[in-house]
Amino acid sequence: METSSKMADQTFLPFVSRPGRYLGSEFNLPEIDILAEVKWALVFPDLYEIGMSHQGLQILYQILNDLDSVAAERCYCPAPDAEAIMRSRGIGLATLESATPLKDYDLLGITLPHELCYTNILTILDLAGLDFRAANRAESAPIIIGGGTCGFNPEPIAELFDAILIGDGEEAVTELSYLVASLKKKRLKRSAIVSELAKVEGVYLPHRYSPSYDTEGKILSLEVIKAGPPTVKRRVLADLNRIDHLYKPLVPNARIVHDRLAVEVARGCTRGCRFCQAGITYRPVRERSVEQVIELAEQGIGHSGFDEISLLSLSTGDYSCLPEVLPELMQRFANEKVSVAMPSMRVGTLTRELMDQIRRVRKTGFTLAPEAGSERLRQTINKGISEADLLQTAEQAYRLGWNLIKLYFMIGLPTETETDIEAIAELVDKTAQAGSVGGGGRKKISVSVGTFVPKPHTPFQWEQQLTIEQSRARLSLLRSKLKKKSITLKYHDPEQSYLEGVFSRGDRRLLPLLIKAWENGARLDSWSEHFNLRRWLESAAQIGVDLDFYLRQRDENEILPWSHIDPMVEPEFLVAERNKSRSLEYTPDCRYHSCQKCGLCDFKTIQPIVHNKKQSPPAKQIINKEPVEEDTVEHHHHYLVSYSRTGTICFLGHLEFLQIIQRALPRANLKPHFSQGFNPSPKISFGPALPVGTMSSCEFFSVDLQQPLTDLNHAKTILDAALPDGLSIIEISPLTGKLVQDMICTYRIELPHDLSEAELETISGLDSIDSMVVERIRKGRRKSLDIRPLINNIRVSAARTIILELISKSAMPGTKPAEALATLLHLDEETVLKLQIMKISWSELEN
């Protein structure tokens, strides 16, 4: 499929939902070397709002663009509506930054975050004009490399890739880039370059391995061909402090899922939860130093304007430097109303002192994960927390003003009984009772439940997974026990967990199923609104695949599809842990106890890096540091800022524009005052919201600043530089009085056709039209509105240009220029979407 036009233009964006997904132009884009010797396209196989929230891709993006003679751009999976338009118009998939077709790159690096994104990989390859199977690709095709969580059992999709990187990618991508650069100079064939990639530690070449199966469908043998190693060892980044590239994080213009500054404080966890794949594949624990965490936070906030810092780790509460880092961050950022969130907290590590710090700006959320309701089952999975720990944490949170606590559990864990399900409800009820302490309003509990999916390289990798019916029955039992209004029960769809389980422990025979399901319409399977299990079941029947085969219990002596992928944790350790789960034997954390002999560390190049090892965190006392008050008396300085918005950025929504301005001000060192209360927001007021797709040369907002502007022209210059392309500051002036809210707005509208005689006659006869009723649906109800009183004037400016004046009042419903013109001239939907609208002036409405 050839690229006939850029996705981010006026001919494409009006026709798709959430056009901000396809704009790019994020703030802090690096300078990309257009003459680079090696060019990467980093691809995330999900929608933009998910991919832009992924820390790993951002890290690799910055690392590659920091290298000499290497360039990297990004691409995300289009939504189904955009995909349909691309196919109908012959638009090939291209990168956000330069709209270069994916097929023109040297390397495609595709993230493998979870199993339910696999059909999206097929969508991406097909829209890029690339064959699904690596063996069938042309000599000119880019080399396609996968990497990420699912790399630890890549077999269901292995044949899509030329190579797969197992483990940490930060250092490996540098080595791959320079290796490919040197091989290109030698003018080697594509196949020869692919073979050479195996020289980089952690790189797996699927074509060098060929499994065979017995009559029962189990793996009989795994033939290693072309002198490949019997196993591929995972790549380990020995020291997290070597990676410090995210000083200037990309700042999205469109809204994304995790819209904040993320700072990884530690990688790896050795708590030893027996269901947890990340606990195996990311060990050992490698902590980032206090100094680097603070520097990344300061630089990141300063360059981004984010109002929240998220401290990332598998269990942030276990970060040994947290008692030092958290109060230091709060002292530096509390006055700027930047909050700190720790989304992954372990019961027992969330202390009163930590909660006191977190709530100083706003009460960011946290989730506690008991995983199991009964003490016995928590011992089975080596969770290592007690009911008393959980209830004490909940009571402290309630006392400190939290009104909502989130709890996470799993069903289907090995040896689980009906009693264990009932124990979940009992524990939730006890947590709710802990909310009877203190004041502050009604306490609520949000309970999230997922079906246990056995993962490769864990002590439970051999266990059987629940069927869909079994999951539903256990959820039904739990639902019947949780009926209090203060308790909300949410659960992951058992059908999605079923499919995840199939691919999680699947083999290469699943690729034909994947392709068939994609051909039958499977897309975005992790999104409930797109997932359709029936489509998968029908596809499996068409090609003769028994999905339940992959959910069965495995024999410990069985060759597993992932047996040749080495996480550097010994299989014997996993077997021993499985046996200990049955005898309820606890395995302590090697961070604070003796080595547990998992086989990973050589204590030379690979070993735990824990800065405060003397005692488990957060036992060390937290020193409460209050923010430094610059002035006890508030000074208010009000300014009116006029600006224009042109180009494709006009396809962002009003809330997205508000967020852009809110982040640009601190980037320009213009500090606004904030509202009071639990969720402070900057004191910025905007004029009437512009419709999506409408440009303007006369927008404005007012801001209440903490300091006066001594040089308005300089302030204009620095604020202009802090805005993304398409937004431009016209003037900053002192504001006296209130912001104008009731006005007449004038729009210039370009039609895609010359005005007909009938349309000209309708326009000239506007005064004779008494009523123009439109119907709108609000919250499921149909309402009628006469918009004729909102049209102040209309006139023809050119053969296909109209000047339209609309009345806008803050206290009454309004109309959009496209709606008004479409109603007046009876325009069809496609014509309306092709209108080019510019707001050219406004004047205050006289009472």
Segments predicted by a language model, with ranges:
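Short, charge-patterned binding micro-sites
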Residues: 451-459, 672-706
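Radical SAM enzyme core and accessory elements
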Residues: 2-29, 36, 40-42, 484-630
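Canonical Radical SAM [4Fe-4S] cluster-binding loop centered on the CxxxCxxC motif
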Residues: 255-291, 597-610
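N-terminal [4Fe-4S]-dependent radical SAM core
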Residues: 11-41, 48-49, 206, 212-262, ...
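Conserved SAM/AdoMet-binding glycine-rich loop
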Residues: 42-44, 299-406, 410-449, 454
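Glycine-rich beta-alpha loop elements in corrinoid/cobalamin-binding modules
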Residues: 78-223, 459-507, 515-529
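Core RNA-modification/binding signature centered on pseudouridine synthases
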Residues: 633-636, 657-659, 768-847
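N-terminal pre-triad scaffold of radical SAM enzymes
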Residues: 42-46, 64, 251-275, 301, ...
